[in-house]
């Protein structure tokens, strides 16, 4: 019997911020979340960094690093984001101080601005619309079972038959997130971007919405269909819920060991390994090179910045960390100590 391998927990490779934009593309942004602390430090001067700061009681100690360039005076903080969270998710003062001291923040895309840009939304969703075929034709014999399951769980939409299977899988991801007790409204992007907008901190998108939607629409069809197949049936959904709960717990405690052991796919378990490798290169390899290039360019210019991208981008090889180290930079982990229970983030 094959032992179930720990996978990156969602059918859409952790792109939960994109899930909600797909399903509620004109939804209002919810920004209510408690943030620990409110102190600010003088801008335009690198911070003195503690590698084991105290995190206020109740705060998450999520994956966090810093990389500096002594020759230029640059200091860039790197936060691993979680695209969904809980209403009581709180970020520690050492994270907020780093954000407020930065000249800019850099997410994959500005999800807050995207939520209010209806023209861009309409442009982006077109990348997920099928051309010359229907979802029923692509899904084939599993179509009726899939539709019935989606209807039963309240995630069916009449427009789905004209959308790529990835869109369907994203709908199922929203079900997983909900069953895991999480909400994308409280994900890292919405929380920190709302704060940045409120405080007038410059926002620099590393990719942007259109680039992400274009990529999602071009995922190999065999990968989209296999991903969707794992989103049908209570056993599949419940397994994803358990993985998602584990993911959130590991993220909350900066659990290096957990993330280092995650896999995106197993060549022995997929129908077309070459398509899955193409997907991996699209989702991770190519994007992480762009992220690393963005960071190294900022370091060479002596900038103070705050980058937050999906946590797996710091672990899936060639990771952002590996690429920065290949350029001669040292990336230092900042592991918060939880004040409430004395736990050191693993």
Model-predicted segments: where are they?
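Positively charged n-region of N-terminal signal peptides that target proteins for export
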Residues: 17-25, 29
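A generic local structural motif
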Residues: 21, 91-93, 292-293
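Structured, acidic catalytic/metal-binding patches in enzyme active sites
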Residues: 46-55, 63-279
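C-terminal motif of bacterial Sec signal peptides marking the signal peptidase cleavage site
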Residues: 34-37
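Bacterial lipoprotein signal-peptidase II cleavage site
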Residues: 39-46
